[in-house]
Amino acid sequence: MTQPNPNKQIVELNRTSLFWGLLLIFVLAILFSNYFFN
């Protein structure tokens, strides 16, 4: 039995979590800038 490469799934998961982390930081930065500059 040949299984799919588990390393590929781990890389995809890390890329997805990195994307969501950056998106979360971006949204928080917008919210904080609106809060401080108004």
From Swiss-Prot:
| Membrane topology recorded in Swiss-Prot or TrEMBL | Single-pass membrane protein
- Name the source's superkingdom: Eukaryota
SUPFAM superfamilies xref list = Photosystem II reaction center protein L, PsbL (SSF161017)
What's one GO BP annotation on this UniProt entry? photosynthesis
Tell me which Pfam families the record gives. PsbL
Q: Name one GO cellular component term.
A: photosystem II reaction center
Residue spans making up a coiled coil are: none
Q: Which UniProt keywords apply?
A: Chloroplast, Membrane, Photosynthesis, Photosystem II, Plastid, Reaction center, Thylakoid, Transmembrane, Transmembrane helix
Entry-linked InterPro entries: PSII_PsbL, PSII_PsbL_sf
Principal location listed in the UniProt entry: plastid
Positions of transmembrane segments: 17-37
Q: Subcellular location, in the record's words? A: Plastid, Chloroplast thylakoid membrane
| Description of how the protein assembles with itself and partners | PSII is composed of 1 copy each of membrane proteins PsbA, PsbB, PsbC, PsbD, PsbE, PsbF, PsbH, PsbI, PsbJ, PsbK, PsbL, PsbM, PsbT, PsbX, PsbY, PsbZ, Psb30/Ycf12, at least 3 peripheral proteins of the oxygen-evolving complex and a large number of cofactors. It forms dimeric complexes.
Per the record, the similarity remark reads: Belongs to the PsbL family.
Functionally, this protein is described as follows:
One of the components of the core complex of photosystem II (PSII). PSII is a light-driven water:plastoquinone oxidoreductase that uses light energy to abstract electrons from H(2)O, generating O(2) and a proton gradient subsequently used for ATP formation. It consists of a core antenna complex that captures photons, and an electron transfer chain that converts photonic excitation into a charge separation. This subunit is found at the monomer-monomer interface and is required for correct PSII assembly and/or dimerization.
What name does this protein carry? Photosystem II reaction center protein L
**Biological source species:** Chara vulgaris (Common stonewort)
